[in-house]
Amino acid sequence: MEKSLLFLFAVTLLSVGCTDAGESKGSIHKEKERSKRQALKHLTVTTIMEQPFSMKSESGMEGFCIDLLSELSQSLGFNYTIKEVKDGRYGAKDQDGNWNGMVGEVLRKEVDLAVAPLTITANRERELAFTKPFMQTGISILLRKEDASENSFLFGFLTPFSKETWIGILVAYMVTSLCLFLVGRLSPCEWTELSTEQNNFTFLNSLWFGAGAFTLQGAEPHPKSVSARIIAVIWWIFSIVLVAAYIASFAAFLNSDSVQTTNIQTFEDLVNQRTLEFGTINSSSTFQFFKNSKNPTYRMIYEYMDKRKDELLVKSFAEGVRRVRESNYAFLGESVMQDIMVAKHCELARAPQIIAGRGYGIAASIDSQLIKQLSIAILEQTESGNIEYLRKKWWDNTCSMKRSAGWNPVQPHTLGGIFLILGIGLALGVIAALIELVLKARNNADQQKKSCCSAFSEEMGERLGTNKENQGAVDSVKS
């Protein structure tokens, strides 16, 4: 009996202990969740004034990052206070090894988050925790168009037509001149005096007549026969269409972005030229990239900027853009932000080459519990298309109505119809000349009582000069 009571007492104590342990574990878990919610309840956020990511407005701040932060706060249920970074910098180590800018404020825990176009780099990743990138970017060259076009090629006037089109035009010109010369020889109406065996359309005259059509003025000699006039009319139509297409294409070329694609298209081109100075933001991730790079070209860029640091490096992106617009200066920076300036300022252009692909992320202290939740929320915003919507909202291209974004030289297939009409016209002209010659031969045959074939052969011989050669051979034999 005593053993039974002891057993029941032990079981009771054990069950009570397990219950207390379970309750304590549950309370610990609830306490952690409560602390997370409290951590997300109100956050202090730092940003930097950079169009169109963050900008001051009458109501406070606006921009891509401001809208993104608002979406994240609604998704995760937190409030925030946003302020501008004190020193106006993104964040880099100074000579004493201390971080400045937004990175420094996060490290010193003056703020909870840095929401800005803050590039994710290895050095920053060692000190901070970053979310998944909300935007991808790289390094490129921002130029002024007149600087970009300064060394444009000498034969730019040939650009409205492609090489194949120019070859086709040259072939058409030569074939038309040859057909005009042939018709001038065959058609009886083109011969001034048959006895002198002279006609107006020699080969040189045919070339001159064809070239004159491009001036829309015409040139002598004027065709007299129906066959020559057919070729002349078709060639004039061809020339008018060609000149109109050239003028339209050349105007589109001058008014398009294609005029900016010149010698400075890569970083190698930038290093090899001597016209433009170039630089970037001091202590920025772009500057650090060139500093740490082992690529010979990139090392040359770093050494050039480092030697004249006070002259070439700027304090902000806005200052870099201003120098590009006002002086012979090329600005090295984030391609995404350069595209914004190109869309806003029509006189600017960005080089095609983009290097050092990287992303923009939200930064927090390395022990922060927020990064995981923020990363998931950013991925949700990306998958839902909201990030793309915000980008279109703030990346408004004010130059799209002022210039043609796309331009291509005229290709042969574009003018295929007029080439076909020219070919048909040339064929009709030659056939008409042969008909004229046949009619002349038939008339001579009736008058001279000869067969049509022999009369046609004589006419052909007179046109081509073979009769004179045969007559000369006969005279030499007789002598």
Swiss-Prot record:
Subcellular location: Cell membrane; Postsynaptic cell membrane
Primary residence: membrane
Organism expressing this protein natively: Xenopus laevis
Gene Ontology CC terms: AMPA glutamate receptor complex; dendritic spine; plasma membrane; postsynaptic density membrane
Family assignment from sequence similarity: Belongs to the glutamate-gated ion channel (TC 1.A.10.1) family.
Gene: kbp
Protein name per Swiss-Prot or TrEMBL: Glutamate receptor U1
Subunit structure as annotated in this protein's UniProt entry: Homomeric.
Keywords: Cell membrane, Glycoprotein, Ion channel, Ion transport, Ligand-gated ion channel, Membrane, Postsynaptic cell membrane, Receptor, Signal, Synapse, Transmembrane, Transmembrane helix, Transport
Keyword match Disulfide bond: no
Glycosylated position list: 79, 282
Matching Pfam families: Lig_chan, Lig_chan-Glu_bd
Ranges of the Extracellular topological domain: 18-163, 251-414
Topological domain spans for side Cytoplasmic: 185-229, 436-479
Chain's role: Receptor for glutamate. L-glutamate acts as an excitatory neurotransmitter at many synapses in the central nervous system. The postsynaptic actions of Glu are mediated by a variety of receptors that are named according to their selective agonists. This receptor binds domoate > kainate > AMPA > NBQX > glutamate.
